[in-house]
């Protein structure tokens, strides 16, 4: 007997890489497209209802930033749109996770006065630290 309401994402603090790995696994298990939403305070995962990225009710999972809490956060989506995260509502998914294990991918920049980190989430789901985009 399978309970489709089981959420496999744990509540323990993790790195962003671990979060993305769990979201990818959750999408595969559910057989559904999942959207990753974020602002400066939190990240949330929603099941995507259709191609219009309409969300279904409340988030599957919501969590605070474990890493980079004191950093400005910028995301460049796979279609080249750039966003600086703010405290605004979580109104659009920056990344989609597909049941095939693939993602739409994104580039991330986290920075403050002293440090800057660049990462990329590949279409294949790998999360890599990079020096230059």
Task: Label each PLM-derived region with a short phrase.
Residues 2, 6-7, 11-14, 25, ...:
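N-terminal helix-rich module
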């Amino acid at each position: 007997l399978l309970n489709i309401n089981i959420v496999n994402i744990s509540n323990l603090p993790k790195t962003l890489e671990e979060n993305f790995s769990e979201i990818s696994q959750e999408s595969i298990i559910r057989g559904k497209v999942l959207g990753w939403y974020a602002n400066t305070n939190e990240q949330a995962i929603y099941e995507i209802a259709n191609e219009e990225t309409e969300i279904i009710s409340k988030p599957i999972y919501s969590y605070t930033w474990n890493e980079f809490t004191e950093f400005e956060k910028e995301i460049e989506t796979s279609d080249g749109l750039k966003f600086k995260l703010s405290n605004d509502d979580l109104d659009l998914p920056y990344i989609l996770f597909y049941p095939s294990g693939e993602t739409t991918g994104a580039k991330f920049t986290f920075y403050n006065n002293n440090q800057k980190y660049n990462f990329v989430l590949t279409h294949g789901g790998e999360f890599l630290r990079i020096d230059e985009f």
